[in-house]
């Protein structure tokens, strides 16, 4: 009964001590150290570790399954553990009690192996991050092999990207010289190698052979057949390659040198040479010609116009036009060919595709997509073209298709988790990242990435700003987005993403607001091409230098007014 004037109190009060769970675990850890109330002993070799079943089951999935599913071990006082380092097991038992773990160069691999065995995914991820942050030309090959053994796909792809980016330094390491033939062949054949010229690849291969000349000498013909000798300078072929004693005493090697020299002496025979050996590599750090394809004019008409920009000469030149007018077109480069994919011709969304050969300045129709689409994202991964999302004339799409140049066929793969039109799409560390875009109702800041090994999509950290119709590209160990539209205004702001931190940060904005902008990497820099500033289409181009964090205006396009698709074909380094 409440007296008049007294404050009425609740009949039920909830009392809690938020720190009790963590404090309780600390007390249990102290009890364990005193050897009290322990009900299980883990034995590995000559080492024994006492613990409490309830703590192990609550903290470690492996023991949860063991102790709650009537396995034989659940009734044993002593459990024999196999295939783990004793110090790693002890550290992981301690982690079960206090949530703390010290990772260093000496224990990271044993901890990762132990965490994998005990199904502690968070620790496995932390160990992978530790290794990824410490990749170095002297250890990256070993880290890649370890990641493959432990089925750590993200670490494996990061190590692979690091190897490609730093190939010249990696080729000087003991790890490289100790590689088996099949691994060296796989490396020297990669399109993604960051080399100033094919001559560096030749020197790396020759150093590997000379490291064990007697055993590896017979491997030289196979190695040279996977190196793009025709792209070496004629003087280098004559003075260095042809004069090497290992090459001179091998008939097959001499034939490959002759083929490379013919490439320079008889240009008319180039189409008859093996395409692989005459195809430039496509690392974004080397120089490449930037092609601007299609787009819109000031009247809003779709264009078939194509022009090419030489970033070294800072000059645009007109190329042969496409067979079809295409705006909001996807562009990709594979095997030295430029593909114009889908888009909008002014009346219809397109599924058709055509390929441009810069040597002949001609366009050729190739296989059409399964779905018509414009405003989609287009990238190349492992020699395959991927198109993601877009707009089919009725709605935004989440569907994804991949194209094989070898079979001229398109295949539907796992769709994105969200419908996205006008998203930014780029390949980064062996994954396809899709950022922002819209679904017709809302504009996104969210990001997801595709693992082509498992055909699965996964979320990544969202951008700081929602945006669609923006540019996206990767360069070195970072991914970038710039410009776009956020629903209320046209953007000049740009962001940079680090996968190690899984977070975005702002970089210096562009000088100009740009929606419908294309972003592409060449010469170790980013080029923002064209766009729309809210009033008019743009022919201007800005170049971003990551070393100075500055944007600089470059020569404007000569034939376009904005909204172009772009692709970069590496320059022949001869």
Swiss-Prot record:
Pathway this chain belongs to: Protein modification; protein ubiquitination
Entry-linked SMART domains: BACK, BTB, Kelch
Tissue occurrence: Predominantly expressed in maturing and mature retinal photoreceptor cells.
UniProt keywords, alphabetically: Cell cycle, Cell division, Kelch repeat, Mitosis, Repeat, Ubl conjugation pathway
A Gene Ontology BP annotation from the UniProt entry: cell division
Residues annotated as domain BTB: 38-105
Disulphide bridges, residue numbers: none
Effect of loss of the gene: Retina-specific gene disruption leads to decreased light response in rod photoreceptor cells and mislocalization of alpha-transducin from the outer segment to the inner part of rod photoreceptors.
Gene3D superfamilies named among the record's database cross-references: 1.25.40.420, Kelch-type beta propeller, Potassium Channel Kv1.1, Chain A
Record domain BACK: where: 140-242
Functional description taken from the UniProt entry: Substrate-specific adapter of a BCR (BTB-CUL3-RBX1) E3 ubiquitin-protein ligase complex required for mitotic progression and cytokinesis. The BCR(KLHL18) E3 ubiquitin ligase complex mediates the ubiquitination of AURKA leading to its activation at the centrosome which is required for initiating mitotic entry. Regulates light- and dark-dependent alpha-transducin localization changes in rod photoreceptors through UNC119 ubiquitination and degradation. Preferentially ubiquitinates the unphosphorylated form of UNC119 over the phosphorylated form.
Name the UniProt record assigns to this protein: Kelch-like protein 18
Organism of provenance: Mus musculus
Gene: Klhl18
């Amino acid at each position: 009964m409440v007296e008049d004037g007294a404050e009425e109190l609740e009949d039920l009060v909830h009392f809690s001590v938020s720190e009790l769970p963590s404090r309780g675990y600390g007390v249990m850890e102290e009890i364990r150290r005193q050897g009290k109330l322990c009900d299980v002993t883990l034995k590995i070799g000559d080492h024994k570790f006492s613990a409490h079943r309830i703590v192990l089951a609550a903290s470690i999935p492996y023991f949860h399954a063991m102790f709650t599913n009537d396995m034989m071990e659940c009734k044993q006082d002593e459990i024999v553990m196999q295939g783990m380092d004793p110090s790693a097991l002890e550290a992981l038992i301690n982690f079960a009690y206090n949530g703390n773990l010290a990772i260093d160069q000496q224990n990271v691999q044993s901890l990762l192996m132990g965490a994998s065995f005990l199904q502690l995914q968070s620790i496995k991820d932390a160990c992978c991050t530790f290794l990824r942050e410490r990749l170095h030309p002297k250890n990256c090959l070993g880290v890649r092999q370890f990641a493959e053994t432990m089925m750590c796909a993200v670490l494996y792809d990061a190590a692979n990207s690091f190897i490609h980016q730093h190939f010249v330094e990696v080729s000087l390491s003991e790890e490289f010289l100790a590689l088996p033939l099949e691994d060296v062949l796989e490396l020297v054949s990669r399109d993604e190698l960051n080399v100033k010229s094919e001559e560096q690849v030749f020197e790396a291969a020759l150093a590997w052979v000379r490291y064990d000349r007697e055993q590896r000498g017979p491997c030289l013909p196979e190695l040279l057949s996977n190196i793009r000798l025709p792209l070496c300078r004629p003087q280098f072929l004559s003075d260095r390659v042809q004069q090497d004693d290992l090459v001179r005493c091998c008939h097959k090697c001499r034939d490959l040198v002759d083929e490379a020299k013919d490439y320079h002496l008889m240009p008319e025979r180039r189409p008859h040479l093996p395409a692989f050996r005459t195809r430039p590599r496509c690392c974004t750090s080397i120089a490449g010609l930037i092609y601007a394809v299609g787009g819109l004019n000031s009247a809003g008409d779709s264009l078939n116009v194509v022009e090419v920009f030489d970033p070294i000469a800072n000059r645009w030149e007109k190329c042969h036009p496409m067979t079809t007018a295409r705006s909001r077109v996807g562009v990709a480069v594979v095997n030295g060919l430029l593909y114009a994919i889908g888009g909008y011709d002014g009346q219809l969304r397109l599924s058709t595709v055509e390929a441009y050969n810069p040597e002949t300045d001609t366009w050729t129709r190739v296989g059409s997509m399964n779905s018509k689409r414009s405003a989609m994202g287009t990238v190349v991964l492992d020699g395959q073209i991927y198109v993601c999302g877009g707009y089919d004339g009725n709605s935004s799409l989440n569907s994804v298709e991949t194209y094989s140049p070898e079979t001229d066929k398109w295949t539907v793969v796992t769709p994105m988790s969200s419908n996205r039109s006008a998203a930014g799409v780029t390949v980064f560390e062996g994954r396809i990242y899709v950022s922002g875009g819209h679904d017709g109702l809302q504009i996104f800041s969210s990001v997801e990435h595709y693992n082509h090994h498992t055909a699965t999509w996964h979320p990544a950290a969202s951008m700081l700003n929602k945006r669609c119709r923006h540019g996206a590209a990767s360069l070195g160990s970072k991914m970038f987005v710039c410009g776009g539209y956020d629903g209320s205004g046209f953007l000049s702001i740009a962001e940079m993403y680090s996968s190690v931190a899984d977070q975005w940060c702002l970089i210096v904005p562009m000088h100009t607001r740009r929606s419908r902008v294309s972003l592409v990497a060449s010469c170790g820099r980013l080029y923002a091409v064209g766009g729309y500033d809210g009033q008019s289409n743009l022919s201007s181009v800005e170049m971003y230098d990551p070393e100075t964090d500055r944007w600089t205006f470059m020569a404007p396009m000569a034939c376009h007014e904005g909204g172009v698709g772009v692709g970069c074909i590496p320059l022949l380094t001869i």
